[in-house]
Amino acid sequence: MLIRFKGAHIVDPGNINEQKDLLVKDGLVHALLDPGAADPEPGIDTVDVTGMLLVPGLIDLHVHLREPGHEYKETIQTGLMAAAKGGFTAVCPMPNTSPVNDNAQVTRFILDRAKAAGLSRVYPVGAITLGLKGETLAEYGEMKQAGMVAITDDGRPVENARVMRRAMEYATGLGLPVMSHSEDLSLARDGAMNEGSFATRIGIKGIPNAAESIMVMREIAIAELTHARVHIAHVSCEESVDAIRHGKQRGVQVTCETAPHYFTLTDKAVGDYDTHAKMNPPLRSEADRLAVIKGLQDGTIDCIATDHAPHSPLEKAVEFDQAAFGIIGLETSLVLSLKLVQDELLSMETLVEKMSRNPARFLGLDNRLIPGNPADITVIDPDRVHVIDPETFVSKSRNTPFAGIEVKGEVLLTMVEGRIIYQREI
Amino acid sequence: MRFEHKDILDMESLSVQDITMILDTAEGMKEISKRPVKKVPTLRGKTIVLLFQEPSTRTKSSFDIAAKRLSADSISLSKSTSSIVKGETLIDTARNLEAMNPDIIVLRHPSSGAPHLIAKHVNASVINAGDGIHAHPSQTLLDLMSVREKKGELQGLNISIVGDISHSRVARSNITGFTKMGANVTISAPATMIPRGIEALGCKVAPDMDSCIENADVIIMLRIQKERQENILFPTEREYAALFGLNAQRLKLAKPDVIVMHPGPLNRGVEISNQVADGRNSVILDQVTNGVAVRMALFYLVAGGSRNADTI
Ligand SMILES: [Zn+2]
């Protein structure tokens, strides 16, 4: 089966940034044709995507699909539907499910469910320690054989530095990167939003920037000691960006991600105790928001992930300090990130690096749009203006602070290995 | 002028005119408490629910007496006596209450913002009787009333607040309330008890207690919560009393006619010495009396008092 995407502007960093036609055959990128070139062979289905952007499929390194254990919030099936609709051809589910993904059986279960869904690719991330308890290392070797690609205790830090050291050493021996949920719990304790004048005003206990940056600095120091590859998850504040920048300059193998809410919103979004603006790490100050954007611009921040964290209204329609942390993001990530391009803060090429190329590198994948590579692509309608409406979400959950916001740009089509897994109804 | 607020949630949402109206109304209410028969029929037939999800005998009694003096039917619900059982959310509770058709709900709750959440789900007026570490507007209004009573006006006064600002809803509401009424507010505490960005509420932070109370017209001492000691806020009560306790010696730094206030209950010998607590500058008991009057005024006003005939 042959498909020709006709008329798109292809943005594939370091490879193509111009108008080309893309030919897909048998699940692979088959050829790139100049606009107007004749079909090289008969029997080609043409998809007219004139005026659209075509990019290598987006990859989200940080999602919570909630299955097994919390299927009332999300299932692998619904999470992957949301991923496809958001333009993601691959996602990395975090291990804090119930049971925890700290053994090969759970890893296999996740991959089986993902296969049954037949949507975006799934690269499971396993636990650093059994039960996320921070004590005993999980069996990374067997989990890797089952398909696990990295380790993290996300949702919790590894509190004991010696355990983290051993985890990094052991993972390095297996070629696995370590993702860090950087949070000093003794500093973050009881906090429900960013520490600062707004939290003081509304009487919510704060989480200081140092609760994050102190742990970022520790992880960099341990990575330096062990020569491990460490990836800092959901970077939210200026001090963390600085620490990572210095770590990179010293040659430490540190990468990191931020999420769209950290460069889009500040702690003021909490407003009148809106629990949809409650997440961990919390939304920070304007200075932090600008530092995150700076980090994206100068390459300190490698990736944009979502930290897609579905919660039902049971967890959110309560007192602010009692509410669960987390927001969903798969269906809003691209459009919120496109705003950086529209505001001329990032080039489209750099954005594709953050949302596709660098995450692929992290996973050891070659996702360039060159003949022979899998046809994982995302087609974006860059001009469509619309209002974010959670009622249209395919995720099981609705916990987003972005409802009602007008945005420009939308995913038109998502393809994994030559199969269209999402196409916007026109 | 009419009082247009359905709810009393914090001091921020009240204007200078609103506050003045509440204080004026409270002065009228205070007179009722001095009568031999301390009861008027103003709110007869109205139902007031006192929902206290955190223990506070003093505040609850004050609201209860205020309701009874206006002839309202008041019922008390607390965690143990109501259907507020584990698993029921605050919104469930609100809906259940709403089904009883109360006119006013007085809520004390350990979570900041809980009254805001309830107010969105009920038709009844909600009065915040203290939420988390956020706000305690009726306390602030009674403090404003006490100061206005003693000093004649609020504009230009120097107000000093000393104690655990971080964990105090009284401090937050008082800073907002007094600055809104034109007073200058200065706070002082060990640095562990000064929350970040508190200046944004309009107060100054003094480097030590002596400079905080220098030339004060009013000193408001806050209660030190001994149970917070696990948070390592200060080394010992002894040292706290020495650095941040109000004693007769220190009181001399303030204006001669300074008044001393405290929301109670007092830790005598810690934040305030016996001599000062019971001394001639203390208005601590007047605060309690004014508390009933202010709460009567709030009930009257949110129940539509200013829109009805004067039936006091
Ligand atoms: Zn995390």
Swiss-Prot record, chain A:
Binding locations of Zn(2+) 2: D154, H181, H234
UniProt KW keywords: Hydrolase, Metal-binding, Pyrimidine biosynthesis, Zinc
Cofactor note: Binds 2 Zn(2+) ions per subunit.
Classification via Gene3D superfamilies: Metal-dependent hydrolases, Urease, subunit C, domain 1
Gene Ontology MF terms in the entry: allantoinase activity; dihydroorotase activity; zinc ion binding
Organism domain of life: Bacteria
Binding site for substrate: H64, L65, R66, N96, N280, H311, F325, G326
Known pathway: Pyrimidine metabolism; UMP biosynthesis via de novo pathway; (S)-dihydroorotate from bicarbonate: step 3/3
InterPro entries xrefs: Amidohydro-rel, DHOase, DHOase/Allantoinase_Hydrolase, Dihydroorotase_CS, Metal-dep_hydrolase_composite, Metal_Hydrolase
GO cellular component: cytoplasm
Co-factor(s): Zn(2+)
UniProt-annotated catalytic positions: D307
Any single Pfam family the record assigns to this protein: Amidohydro_1
Function: Catalyzes the reversible cyclization of carbamoyl aspartate to dihydroorotate.
Family to which this protein belongs: Belongs to the metallo-dependent hydrolases superfamily. DHOase family. Class I DHOase subfamily.
Protein name: Dihydroorotase
Gene of this entry: pyrC
From Swiss-Prot, chain B:
Pathway: Pyrimidine metabolism; UMP biosynthesis via de novo pathway; (S)-dihydroorotate from bicarbonate: step 2/3
Positions with a binding annotation for L-aspartate: K86, R169, R223
Domain of life: Bacteria
GO BP of this protein: 'de novo' pyrimidine nucleobase biosynthetic process; 'de novo' UMP biosynthetic process; amino acid metabolic process
PROSITE patterns: CARBAMOYLTRANSFERASE
EC class (word): transferase
Gene: pyrB
Similarity comment: Belongs to the aspartate/ornithine carbamoyltransferase superfamily. ATCase family.
Recorded catalytic activity of this chain's protein: carbamoyl phosphate + L-aspartate = N-carbamoyl-L-aspartate + phosphate + H(+)
GO cellular component labels: cytosol
Provenance organism: Desulforapulum autotrophicum (strain ATCC 43914 / DSM 3382 / VKM B-1955 / HRM2) (Desulfobacterium autotrophicum)
This protein's name: Aspartate carbamoyltransferase catalytic subunit
UniProt KW keywords: Pyrimidine biosynthesis, Transferase
Cleaved signal peptide residues: none
Record's subunit section: Heterododecamer (2C3:3R2) of six catalytic PyrB chains organized as two trimers (C3), and six regulatory PyrI chains organized as three dimers (R2).
HAMAP family: Asp_carb_tr
Function noted in UniProt: Catalyzes the condensation of carbamoyl phosphate and aspartate to form carbamoyl aspartate and inorganic phosphate, the committed step in the de novo pyrimidine nucleotide biosynthesis pathway.
